[in-house]
A protein has these predicted regions:
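Short beta-strand-centered segment that lines the nucleotide-binding/catalytic pocket of NTP-utilizing
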Residues: 86-98, 154-158
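Pre-Walker A (pre-P-loop) alpha-helix and adjacent loop at the N terminus of AAA/AAA+ ATPase modules
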Residues: 25-62, 67
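C-terminal engagement/docking regions of AAA+ P-loop ATPases
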Residues: 13-18, 258-334
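Conserved C-terminal "switch" segment of AAA+ ATPases
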Residues: 20, 24, 41, 177, ...
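Walker A/P-loop
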Residues: 57-93
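Short glycine-rich substrate-engagement loop in P-loop NTPases that contacts/grips substrate
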Residues: 96-123
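Conserved AAA+/SF3 P-loop NTPase catalytic/coupling segment centered on the Walker-B
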Residues: 122-146, 160, 175-184, 196-202
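AAA+/SF3 P-loop NTPase mechanochemical coupling elements
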Residues: 114-123, 152-169, 180-189
């Protein structure tokens, strides 16, 4: 049973929609149109596209883990184009400084300082190979993700909204890298694993990318509409049993606590924190709306649970020695 949405109308919603129900229907239609447009260029990555769009409408950020050459840059560029948002890509290297990301003050001819914005000043930022840069530079990016603003020379500069960061990591080459600590990983809503395309998908990719024609995507939404839909997601009502399921799921991952499962205590060194519970509910709200429902159920929580918990659970030596993955542990908990 799905609860009806309230008739509350926000300032942004009142531009186009008479009620939240009408706005919810428009979001579902826009989502399917986005999937169609993105599918013209991005082939065989349907689950990745679903999760990235869910994060955008949930005001979350994504960590994308995959080997080079799987079209991570093309994916986020295509999504930015279809959403009519500005896009910047930052290649993280060991010598990258915080000022290279957030910007710096320069001396003008009038002998005063002028702030020159860095690449972080875009709606969508691709932080490529974030684990290749020192912690000081990582922290500058992660602060902007949390605060939606940067501070340079004591002055605070707000970032343009909507603001979304997609950071990538290469799981193979770990030499000379600076792994993100758990506290920093917790800033990301989703950890998405990007796998190789299927044989059929790769056939289509090769045909599409080796010809002289290049498909283009239509702009489906603009910034004001995206912000309106982000506020709509937050207003979706949730039944108590769904909230209880999400919080209970997170508590099951905390080894040695009253509500932890025996399996979690046996295999995990560390469990998920309260931010995971928050992301589960917001992600479930968004997943419900994108699929034409007006309130989430437990299945919507399950639909976003793995990418939310994947980077928040730390396996112990026993789990690593036995080759038990975080994915296996999460699926057992579900």
């Amino acid at each position: 049973m799905h609860l009806p949405l309230t008739s509350h109308v926000s300032v942004l919603m009142s531009i186009q929609f008479s009620s939240d129900k009408e706005a919810a229907d428009a979001l579902a239609r826009s989502y399917h149109a986005l999937r169609q447009e993105i599918g013209k260029i991005i082939i065989g990555q349907d689950e990745v596209v679903r999760l990235v769009l869910t994060a955008v409408f949930s005001q979350g950020h994504c960590l994308l883990v995959g080997v080079p050459g799987l079209a991570k840059t093309l994916l986020i560029q295509t999504i930015a184009d279809s959403l009519d948002l500005s896009f910047n890509r930052v290649q993280f290297t060991p010598d990258l400084m915080p000022s290279d990301i957030v910007g710096s003050e320069t001396l003008t001819q009038q002998r005063d300082f002028q702030f020159v914005p860095g690449p972080i000043f875009a709606n969508i930022v691709l932080a490529d190979e974030i684990n290749r840069t020192p912690p000081k530079t990582q922290a500058a990016l992660l602060e902007s993700m949390q605060e939606y603003a940067v501070t340079v020379a004591g002055k605070r500069y707000p970032l343009e909204r909507p603001f979304f960061v997609l950071a990538t990591q290469n799981p193979i080459e770990q030499e000379g890298t600076y792994p993100l600590p758990e506290a920093q990983l917790d800033r990301f809503m989703f950890n998405i694993e990007l796998g190789y395309p299927s044989y059929e998908a790769e056939l289509q990719i090769v045909k599409n990318t080796t010809s002289d024609t290049k498909p283009t995507v239509s702009k489906i939404l603009h910034a004001a509409e995206i912000q309106a839909f982000q506020h709509l997601v937050r207003r979706v009502p949730v039944a108590d049993n769904v909230v209880e399921y999400a919080v209970s799921l997170v508590h099951k991952t905390r080894p040695g606590t009253d509500r932890a499962t025996a399996r979690a205590t046996q295999l995990l060194e560390w469990g998920a924190g309260p931010r995971a519970s928050q992301h589960l509910i917001v992600g479930a709200k968004c997943n419900a709306l994108l699929n034409g429902k007006y309130s989430p159920d437990i299945e919507d929580v399950k639909a976003v649970a793995l990418p939310i918990l994947r980077h928040r659970l730390v396996r112990n030596f026993k789990a690593e020695a036995e080759g038990i993955t975080v994915e296996q542990i999460v699926k057992e908990l579900l």
